[in-house]
Swiss-Prot record:
Binding residue positions for ATP: 12-20
Protein name: Cytidylate kinase
EC category name: transferase
Entry's localization field: Cytoplasm
Family: Belongs to the cytidylate kinase family. Type 1 subfamily.
Taxonomic placement: Bacteria, Pseudomonadati, Pseudomonadota, Gammaproteobacteria, Pseudomonadales
Keywords assigned: ATP-binding, Cytoplasm, Kinase, Nucleotide-binding, Transferase
An example Gene Ontology molecular-function term: ATP binding
EC number, UniProt record: 2.7.4.25
GO CC annotation: cytosol
Single Gene Ontology BP annotation: nucleobase-containing small molecule interconversion
Origin superkingdom: Bacteria
Length: 228
């Protein structure tokens, strides 16, 4: 870790566009990328591969501290690559089974602490784009630029609906909207690291904005802070 390397945190709820914006910005600047939300899935997947029980806090803590993972920003319109121990696991960690495992390991305090340190280790020159829910409030509270990206629940459900339909999945817009509202409530009401903007975050509502318009606003903030 290089504590002097600049960090841009991009937090926000599911479907706000933060992952897309983070990936494009990292690619544009040539900075490192951290998808913090994927780390719990990666840990659950890695634990299963190594025969580690998902309730064994000590072994999970050790695995978390040494996760060999790299996030590669994708070209526009494509998904980012997630490389675990040299293998592309971008798709396999998105299964329901891995997701259930991720929820289990995320409930263990020692694992959360180990992953907190692992996330901070991504901070290297020339800089880091950190995408998540508590990047600006918990993981990188000293980041020189913090962005909190949101959009209406209806717009986020619509985006997710189009994404899943594009993959050929049979989904209901109303059920997706219900899921997003339920997740928003869980994220904002949880006792540990609730979803909320940092006091010094730039808040952007992307409901009526294109990805390029969001990027333009962030570029302006970067220039004002002499970060690029």
């Amino acid at each position: 870790m290089n504590s002097q390397a600049p960090v841009i945190t991009i937090d926000g709820p599911s479907g706000s566009g933060k992952g897309t914006v983070a990936g494009l910005l990292a690619r544009e600047l040539g900075w490192r990328l951290l998808d913090s939300g994927a780390l719990y899935r990666l840990l659950a997947f890695n634990a299963s591969n190594h025969g580690v029980d998902l309730t064994n806090e000590e072994l999970l803590k050790a695995l978390a501290a040494h996760l060999d993972v790299q996030f590669i920003a994708a070209e526009p319109g494509k998904l980012q690559q997630i490389i675990l121990e040299g293998e592309d696991v971008s798709n396999v960690i998105r299964t329901e089974t891995v997701g259930a495992g991720a929820s289990m390991v995320a409930s263990l305090p020692a694992v959360r602490e180990a992953l907190l340190q692992r996330q901070r280790a991504f901070r290297e020159t020339p800089g880091l784009i950190a995408d998540g829910r508590d990047m600006g409030t918990v993981v990188f509270p000293d980041a020189p630029l913090k962005v909190f990206l949101t959009a209406s629940a209806e717009e986020r459900a619509r985006r997710r609906y189009l994404q899943l339909k594009g993959k050929g999945e049979d989904v209901s817009l109303s059920s997706l909207l219900d899921e997003i509202r339920a997740r928003d409530e869980r994220d904002t009401q949880r006792a540990v690291a609730p979803l909320k903007p940092a006091a010094d975050a730039i808040q952007l509502d992307s409901t009526e904005l294109s990805i390029e318009q969001v990027l333009h606003r962030i570029r302006s903030e970067l220039a004002q802070r002499d970060l690029v």
